Amino acid sequence: MDRERTCAVPDLGPEVYSRWRASEIGATTERLESQLVLELVGNVGGRKVLDVGCGDGELALELAKRGAVVTGIDASAAMIDAAKRRAVQHNADIMFQVATAQQIPFAAEQFDVVTAITVLCFVEDASPVFREIARVLRPGGRLIIGELGKWSSWAAGRRIRAWLGSRLWRQGRFRTAHELCGLAGQAGLMVESVRGAIYYPRWGFATRLLSPCDSALGRLTTFGAGFMALSAVKPAR
């Protein structure tokens, strides 16, 4: 992968997603992250939604079930193939195609909502991604960015794995809530809120003990959050 994520992220294929969701901690973490993202997305019935970095289509499918007209893009052909299979299995009408976050292949002001979940953590320069998202959003449209938190036990573990030679996490880029807000503002978007999730360490007993408190903590601070979600809108004319 080059510095702008113009190709697929190594070591991160559909089978990795499947194994993660099959684990206890993975299932709980995925549920809490999805709850936060969907809460910030709000009502999508009849709206055109673009899921940037759609992966294997899990979020795109949930948005389609809620009545959205969904398009998903991802730099990985393997992920897009998996997303298409998922849509067929659930009889969902979703358009998927291979494309990068830096060059979204759609005309300006096409979408009411854009989601981009754990995309920027593999992009060194996130500014072009925010500009592209702002370009394809309609005035009044909403962006939901979901990212890995910079100051958390999860991020510390990923840094250690990078130091030990992980190809995946050597490319990881962790940003603060302040940095994400700045990037959104530079792209002409108005930040509505930033919320945190996943405050427990990556241990099964800690997940069971602390996950019930996650939503309340996420409304108070993003410090210590393994995951953050930002909601921003494109000003109406």
Predicted regions and their residues:
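A conserved beta-strand element that flanks and buttresses the S-adenosyl-L-methionine
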Residues: 115
